[in-house]
Regions:
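Contiguous domain-boundary segments centered on the initiation and propagation of an alpha-helix
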Residues: 1-47, 86-87, 91-163, 227, ...
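A two-mode feature
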Residues: 2-4, 128, 160, 164-243
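A generic local secondary-structure boundary/capping motif
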Residues: 39-43, 50-52, 72, 80-83, ...
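Conserved active-site and cofactor/substrate-binding residues in soluble primary-metabolism enzymes
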Residues: 46-48, 78, 99-103, 123-131, ...
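Short beta-strand scaffold segments in enzyme catalytic cores
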Residues: 50-54, 60-62, 145-150, 220-225, ...
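Beta-strand scaffold of nucleotide-dependent catalytic cores
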Residues: 61-65, 74, 159-162, 235
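Active-site cofactor/substrate anionic-group-binding motifs, chiefly glycine-
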Residues: 64-87
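A short, polar/proline- and glycine-enriched secondary-structure boundary/capping micro-motif
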Residues: 71-79, 103-105, 169-172, 243
Length: 243
């Protein structure tokens, strides 16, 4: 039977990869395995994590728990700050590998600082989300699943990012191992006209709910308030201090 691909560049590439490479990859959402079988996962510090972000009537509120685990089985740290300022009107909250998260934050912050130095202004949040997703897609951050939030002339923004490079905007979101429990609270309690104080309460309830059921989340909460002027991050060893 005649094969239209015979002798074509497509066929030569198939032969070159010896059948081990899908010629249609990479597809949207697919990740390279990097030759890593996962054998070292038990030695990797992970934040396990519940992180949430939600817009308010004048900004954005984020919240995250404070627990890190080793291989998902042992609590390795009880005082981890999983949210960092990227620029004075934007912050990033992280779930996944601690090392990958720290490297990603440094890279994104450096790009934001370079943009400000060249342009004399902060990067708008949509552009910052695009930059973040491009870094995730092209860089060695395969175990990092962040939430980016910020406030610009168009109001508050919350973006869910993932290692495939996707960037999804919503009024509220959650990531991490405690996401199902946190999202249940956000679905029930979120409204479009929440004040900042009300949003803090909702975010704290979401973290508290996840900490009750998810063994990789707990040990306190960091609450982050973002406006057009500044990012304020406050830690509490007990979620009840916020509720």
């Amino acid at each position: 039977m005649f094969n239209s691909n015979e002798g074509s560049e497509f066929a030569r590439n198939q032969a070159r990869f010896g059948g081990t490479q899908n010629p249609y990859e990479p597809e949207v959402g697919s990740l390279p395995d990097g030759g890593n079988s996962g054998a070292d996962d038990e030695y990797v510090n992970k934040t396990g994590t519940t992180i949430v972000g939600l817009t308010t009537d004048d900004g954005v509120v984020m919240a995250s728990d404070m627990r890190a685990s080793l291989g998902g089985r042992v609590v390795s740290n009880k005082d981890v700050q999983k949210v960092e300022e990227i620029q004075p009107n934007a912050a990033l909250s992280m779930s996944g590998s601690v090392g990958g998260a720290q490297s990603f934050i440094r890279s994104l912050r450096a790009e934001a600082n370079l943009y400000e130095a060249r342009r004399g202004e902060y990067m708008n949040i949509n552009a910052l989300a695009t930059m973040a997703s491009n870094l995730l897609r092209g860089g060695p951050f395969f175990r990092v699943v962040p939430i980016l939030a910020g406030v610009d002339d168009d109001g508050g923004h919350v973006f869910s990012l993932d290692p495939s490079g996707s960037s999804l905007s919503d009024s509220y979101t959650a990531q991490g191992s405690g996401m199902p429990y946190a999202l249940g609270v956000l679905e029930q309690e979120f409204t479009d006209d929440l004040s900042t104080d009300e949003a803090v309460q909702v975010a704290a309830q979401a973290i508290d709910s996840a900490s009750e059921r998810d063994t990789a989340s707990g040990n306190g909460i960091h609450v982050t308030k973002i406006t057009r002027e500044n990012v304020e991050i406050i830690g509490h060893k007990d979620v009840d201090d916020v509720l």
